[in-house]
Amino acid sequence: PNAGWSDYYANESFFLNYPDDARKEWNYMTEWETKNGHVTYKESADKLPAISKYYDYDNGAPGKSAQANGITCIYRYADVLLMYAEASTRATNSVNAQALDAIQKVQKRAGYAQDQLTTTTDPTAFTTAVFNERGWEFFAEMKRWFELVRLEKVSEVRAETWNGSLFQ
């Protein structure tokens, strides 16, 4: 990152709580080269991990970059699966096999080991797991704010933000 106008940085506590799966490696840059040599995010001016999941519009090819000339918000199959998992659980106040299958499909695609998959059938614990999974899966896709408002969690999460930003 060059600390220019198009760089995007992540909340460190969110980064530290992010599962060590394939998404984390793709979504974040934690070290990079500068004109002064190799640095880690903790050595950088902002001391924050860089968000690196955007398309490289200048070069016309996908790549890892903390810069984005335009943020592409999309709805993905993972979004549909997690919406289903949450909605069916809230509608019936129970976790059915299809809801478990939906969240586990997202987790398996992300590279979770079998023992890391969500297996709870407690509705409260399950909806919390879905909320967390949505945060990790849709990191920096501009969905988090709406999740926080919808679930009335803004004040709960705001205390953990850097510089008052709820970018995730």
Labelled PLM ranges:
Residues P1-F14:
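Polar, glycine-rich mid-to-C-terminal structural blocks
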Residues D20-Q168:
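Acidic/polar-rich alpha-helix caps and helix-coil junctions
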